[in-house]
């Protein structure tokens, strides 16, 4: 069962109309808690709310590296549902009115380097499944240029170099994840043609 399927099962089980969806690696700050409580005491004008996340990795608050604009829809009316994908599921936003909260969730996405690498491995499996039918043939472009551009995106364009060594590590591992995705798609294509 994918994370989206798990969440879609859990949402209607809620006894209240509003649900705050949290992943195990997310923490509600006292400021965010106050904002949500205050919001729920008034008539709700929206169907769901974006919440920005402040990520931490290797003991450091990450200010750049592509993680600075990270936001997720987490406070939802129980009529909302997630799309059915294997990785990075999102609330289906068609015909719903979405707001944005001011305060952030704390996001401790990776406990350590081994955890980051294990998660990238798992995400690349799911991502390969999601992209398998969209990628007719894996080419030199997929295996070499897409990972290279992912590194450039995180390290240069999204200012990962300002996060120092940790920014370099994040950018490198994100590029590695793209490489793994396409190697796994290639593997599936080879075995499907046998």
Model-flagged regions — what are they?
Residues 5-12, 18, 22, 29-192:
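Catalytic-site signature of metal-activated, phosphate-bearing donor transferases
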Residues 1:
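Conserved short acidic donor-positioning loop in nucleotide-sugar-dependent glycosyltransferases
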């Amino acid at each position: 069962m994918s994370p989206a399927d798990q969440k879609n099962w859990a949402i209607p089980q809620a006894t209240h109309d509003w649900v705050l969806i949290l992943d195990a690696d997310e923490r509600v700050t006292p400021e965010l808690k106050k904002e949500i409580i205050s919001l729920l005491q008034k008539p709700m004008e929206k169907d769901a709310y974006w919440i920005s996340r402040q990520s931490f990795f290797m003991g450091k608050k990450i200010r750049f590296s592509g993680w600075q604009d990270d936001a997720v829809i987490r406070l939802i009316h129980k009529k909302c549902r997630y799309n059915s994908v294997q990785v990075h599921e999102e609330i289906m936003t068609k015909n719903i009115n979405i707001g944005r909260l001011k305060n952030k969730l704390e996001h401790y996405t990776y406990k350590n380097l081994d955890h980051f690498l294990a998660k990238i491995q798992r995400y690349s499996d799911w991502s390969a499944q999601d992209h398998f039918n969209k990628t007719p043939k894996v080419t030199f472009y997929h295996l070499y240029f897409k990972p290279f551009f992912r590194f450039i995106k995180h390290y240069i364009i999204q200012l990962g170099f300002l996060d120092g060594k940790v920014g370099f590590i994040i950018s490198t591992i994100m590029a590695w994840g793209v490489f793994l995705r396409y190697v796994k798609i290639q593997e599936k294509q080879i075995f499907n043609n046998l």
